Amino acid sequence: MTSAPRPRPTLDDLPLREDLRGKSPYGAPQLAVPVRLNTNENPHPPTQALVDDVVRSVGEAAVDLHRYPDRDAVALRTDLANYLTAQTGTRIGFENVWAANGSNEILQQLLQAFGGPGRTAIGFVPSYSMHPIISDGTHTEWVETARADGFGLDIDAAIAVVSDRRPDVVFITSPNNPTGQSVSLTELRRLLDVVPGILIVDEAYGEFSSQPSAVGLIEEYPTRLVVTRTMSKAFAFAGGRLGYLVATPALIDALLLVRLPYHLSSVTQVAARAALRHAQDTLGSVATLIAERERVSKKLAGMGFRVIPSDANFVLFGEFADAPAAWQRYLDQGVLIRDVGIPGYLRATTGLADENDAFLRASARIAATDLAPAAASPVGAP
């Protein structure tokens, strides 16, 4: 006689850490839809020359896959330093650069080294939602304070809370995700003057910003400032999973204490180096995306939506009567955007022109419904 199959265990059946119970994993919806504007990728695919270079580079590396990779990724860090020197105008050496599997691993290593039990991290919300998740995962106390009306950073309020709470880690995202504003070097200097620990300036969208990179301040604040970046956004290398940081060499020495051995594969290293060799071609799309972002913003404003001025490759817009319902209405029309959890607002990545047109047509239809702001109008669709 066949016994009944045992029920599959659930999380409740496992000896999970108590602080993880009831939590949900991070992640944007992955759905097969005609228009995907929800994860802020560069919509322009790699050039054939870049594809060929990656294939050749990986093929050459494959003969040594029986060996561990360069654990310190010196060649890749040298190429990243050369790129940053050209892009920011600040001379950077490989000893100032560290790389990992996406900027999230970089952030995790930073919190492992400078956060932890008995230590505190502060963020100004709404901002990148992985900052509190990584803080929780490293047992760093997370403290958040609201941004100003309009979602900008109130630097005076930020200085006050940092001076009062004396955190070990401060997060500033510039341009800020999901709201889009950059922070000036003058404002960062004011904050750095009072930060007791380290200030992490998250420049994931730095190539889109109208403000200079904070890497120019590292020499002035070597023990307080670290700048994190990624190749997942402007660099159109999201599938390659490569993040990096710029800091004084001593800070990188600290990360060597917590990094996993051989954390960055040979394949990732050579593929990223190939992408860097084609940086000029890839980043040529940045100006196009900025122009499209401005076109989309103007059209949305013309329909009556409130559009938050953006310095990145996305726009935050509202004010919807019911943002989750509006998100579903976009999805029903084949357009996937992001509900970032801000009441009344949704975020849309800047895509290719035809993708943006499809998004604007869907927006015009929603502007004529009871989900839209009171002042919204369908006028202005392409």
From Swiss-Prot:
Its EC number is 2.6.1.9. SUPFAM superfamilies: PLP-dependent transferases (SSF53383). Its cofactor is pyridoxal 5'-phosphate. The modification N6-(pyridoxal phosphate)lysine is found at K233. It catalyses: L-histidinol phosphate + 2-oxoglutarate = 3-(imidazol-4-yl)-2-oxopropyl phosphate + L-glutamate. It holds the Pfam family Aminotran_1_2. Residues 1-28 are annotated as: Disordered. Residues 9-22 have a biased composition (Basic and acidic residues). It comes from the Bacteria. Keywords: Amino-acid biosynthesis, Aminotransferase, Histidine biosynthesis, Pyridoxal phosphate, Transferase. It is an enzyme of class 2 (transferase). GO terms for biological process: L-histidine biosynthetic process. GO terms for molecular function: histidinol-phosphate transaminase activity; pyridoxal phosphate binding. Pathway: Amino-acid biosynthesis; L-histidine biosynthesis; L-histidine from 5-phospho-alpha-D-ribose 1-diphosphate: step 7/9. Disulfide bonds: none annotated. Belongs to the class-II pyridoxal-phosphate-dependent aminotransferase family. Histidinol-phosphate aminotransferase subfamily. Homodimer. This is Histidinol-phosphate aminotransferase. It comes from Mycobacterium marinum (strain ATCC BAA-535 / M).
